[in-house]
Structures are given as structure tokens and as C-alpha cells.
Amino acid sequence: MGVRIYNTATRQVEEFVTYVPKLARGYVCGITPYDHVHVGHGRVYVFFDMFRRYLEARGYEVRLVINFTDIDDKIINKAREEFGHDAYKRWKEVPERYIAEFFEMSNKLFIKPAHAYPRVTENVNEMVAWISTLVEKGYAYVAPDGSVYFEVGKVPNYGVLSRQKIEELIAGARVEPEPGKKNPLDFALWKSWTPGEPWWNSPWCPGRPGWHLECVVMSTKYLGAPFDFHGGGADLIFPHHENEIAIAKAYYGLDNFAKYWIHVGYLTVRGEKMSKSLGNVITLREVLSKYSGEALRLAYAMSHYRKPMEFSFELLDQAEEMVKTLYTAYDELSQAVADASDEDKEKLEYGKYIESFYAALEDDFSTPQAAQQLYGLARYIISTVLHRIDKASRQTAIDVLTQYVKMADILGVLERREIPKEVEEVIKAVVEARARLRREKMYQLADYLRERLAGIGVELHDFGQRTYYTYKRR
């Protein structure tokens, strides 16, 4: 069975077929770096990291691009709050600070680096060129103050992504009217300069690009058009992604410049949508100072990506315990592989977990079911495989371990499994010495070594004459 994913553009779960076989080109809208990254951001980027890992496991090359909107009203306002009259000179410090935090938190969440992280400020010339083309084609117009607006009414089927009609949007007063606009729904491609704000030159006036244009220009610059998938949070469907489609349709003549539109649901805290206005925003720094990145990844995985996720620290406690179980299974099986025999005396029934894991991901990326199967396999390893390892061939044991690691790698939840080689050699030597002491019935000294190892995070598990160890990662 092939990969199947929900496409917001068609409102259907569709088979994922890329334009170029085994090459998946994707763009995910990045942060506007004016404040701390929060767990809502984390959910989006962890999902697309898992999706990427899964595609790579299926043999795809994945080219992923994530942008930074490093100039925006929110950044300017933040700079004014912090620097006052010096904001014009020091505004760049704001995005630099929070972009650095984004990368720091991404590392702690074991998110694989994207292939490019374009910034708006590095692509202004390309954006000016796009606007000039749109004006020439008659899809954009220059307002009296030099701002340039996209004329929504010139594009057929505007609202196709969000399934809304222009008349209904106007009647619902979804967009604030501005001087110089022909239509309240028209949006800025170029914003005229306001004294005290950063600006760039253009044929119309000093100013800066509009948000919706920025993502179209950067995505197609790095991926071409059309490309395979475009993603972000569900809150971006309208107006941001809707307006991107309109711009690309006018520029390229394409009905859709991305084949699949993939959106991640929002987070709730105590039943309310997480937002600054409600004061219930939880930052990634706060969470990752108390919990492992793998626990947060697993907590995200326990909710289907398209559904709202109720976030709680109780959920993280549960996820952290599950991560410990996953590591225990990995560590104990890794140690036990060496003791397996050379021939099968008994079959190990582990295939159902693997089949169900991949079947879940093939069906609109159901990570709750996939996580359940991975955890089920971990428990099976601990309760069954280790106690019957002498009856299974070494190759069977290796196969179990290999498949287990592949599954965990897709969800990104065994990322700290490697122990430094020097440390591992010392641990093995002490474990072997303790085993000799036990054989010679020098139990008091053997117990002393067990206690000393426990003090550095190494737990010993005795199965008859065999001893395995697990390493508690810090």
C-alpha cells in the first residue's frame, strides 16, 4: 500500500504521488521570530519531521524548506518595546534572538535540519520582481501612498482552499478595510514605509514586502513550481495559504502551485485554544527544561495531526514513562542479542506490531496507532523476547532489534540511544567483573558494584546467569 495523506485542497485522503518519483519537495511556513517558540509551534514542526522521516524510510529523498518571516509588524513592535528610540537601529536583534531559540529547541526535539531556511530580508529583490510582474499582468495595483495590493477579484475561484466565497467573506467582515484598497479582501504585496521602520527600495516607494507574497516567492525559489506539499498550522488556511494560491495562480497560471496542502491542528489547554490573549501559552523552553524531547514528540504523536490536541503536563508524565519503557526494551534487547543461539528453536511473534505500525502511517499518518504499536512491541520485547532469547536464532533477535529501531526512528523517540564508546567499554568491563563475582558467590562485592553503577545511571538486570544493563539517559 502506498502513502496516503489528507489534502486540504480536495478535502480527501489521497495517495501521495510526487511529481518526480521518490523525490518529495515540501515547504512548511516557519515562525515570525518576535517571541519565544511554544508547544503549538513544536507540534507543527515535529509532525513534518516525522512525515519526512517516514518518507525517507520509504525510500524518498525529501527536500524540505522552512522560512523565517524576519521582518513583520510584530517584530517592529517588539523592537520598540525593548529598544525605544533605538528600535530602528536594533530591530534585527529581535529576530536573531528568536531564530537562535528556534534552532536550539529544534535540536532538543531531535528535528532533522531542513535543506534551506530562507529569510524574507534575504529575498526582497526577488519579491520586488514578482510584484512588478503581477502589476504588469493586471493582478496588482499601486495605491496613492505607493503600497501595492493584490486584486483578489481578478483571480477565478478565490477561496478554493478554505471553501469560502468572496461575497460571504466581505459580508462577514473578515478583513479590515484600508485606504487605497479597491476591495476589502485585497491584500498588500508591498507596504509603504512608515517613519521609524525598516525599509527597502522599490519602483513604487520605500517599504517592505507583504506576508502572503513572501512564502510564495521563497517556496518556489527553492523548490520550483509546482512542488509536492505545502504545510503549516490549520490557522494558516485562511487567509495566508489562500492568498498564496491566488498569487501563484496569477504569476504562473497554475491552479495550485503545491499538490498537497497539509495542515496540523491547534493545541488546547484546559479546553481553550492556546493563545497569547488568554495567557495560556506554554513555551518549548519551559517544557524541555523538565521533559525530554522524545517525551514531547511522543505526546504529540498520541494525537492525530489533524485533530485539536489537549496539552497537559499529565500527558507529558505519561509520555516520559513510555519513553523509559522504549529505552529499556532497546537496551535489554541490544545486550541479549549476543546470547542468542545460532538456530531457531521457537518463533517469536512480533511481526504483527511492525505490520500494524506501518499500516497506521500509510492511512493518513495515524501516529496514535503507530505509537501504540511501537510501545506494544517494546512491552513484548521486555515481557517475552528476553525470556525466550535462547530459543531464537541470533538473526531473529537482530531482526527484531533492527525493525524496532526503524520504527522508533520514524517517530524520533530513541534519539539518545548511543552511549559514548569509552563509557560503554568501562560499563561492560564492570558488568563482566560483577558476573565473575556472582559466580564465585562474592555477593556482597557484587552488590556494591551494582550500587555504584546505579549511581551513574546504569541499572543491572539479572536473568539466571546472564546480566544485562540499561543506561538511564540524563
UniProtKB/Swiss-Prot annotation:
UniProt binding sites for Zn(2+): 29, 215, 240, 244
InterPro entries referenced in this protein's UniProt entry, alphabetically: Cys-tRNA-ligase, Cys-tRNA-synt_Ia_DALR, Cys-tRNA/MSH_ligase, Rossmann-like_a/b/a_fold, tRNA-synt_1_cat_dom, tRNAsynth_Ia_anticodon-bd
Domain of life from the UniProt record: Archaea
One Gene Ontology cellular component annotation held by this UniProt entry: cytoplasm
Sequence motif 'HIGH' region, residues: 31-41
Record text on cofactor binding: Binds 1 zinc ion per subunit.
Pfam families per UniProt: DALR_2 (PF09190), tRNA-synt_1e (PF01406)
Cofactor(s) required, per the database record: Zn(2+)
Record-listed E.C. numbers: 6.1.1.16
Any single GO BP term: cysteinyl-tRNA aminoacylation
Motif 'KMSKS' region location, chain numbering: 273-277
Record's catalysed reaction(s): tRNA(Cys) + L-cysteine + ATP = L-cysteinyl-tRNA(Cys) + AMP + diphosphate
Binding site for ATP: 276
Single GO term (MF): zinc ion binding
Entry-linked SUPFAM superfamilies: Anticodon-binding domain of a subclass of class I aminoacyl-tRNA synthetases, Nucleotidylyl transferase
HAMAP family (UniProt xref): Cys_tRNA_synth
Annotated family: Belongs to the class-I aminoacyl-tRNA synthetase family.
The protein, known as: Cysteine--tRNA ligase
Organism: Pyrobaculum aerophilum (strain ATCC 51768 / DSM 7523 / JCM 9630 / CIP 104966 / NBRC 100827 / IM2)
Higher taxonomy: Archaea, Thermoproteota, Thermoprotei, Thermoproteales, Thermoproteaceae
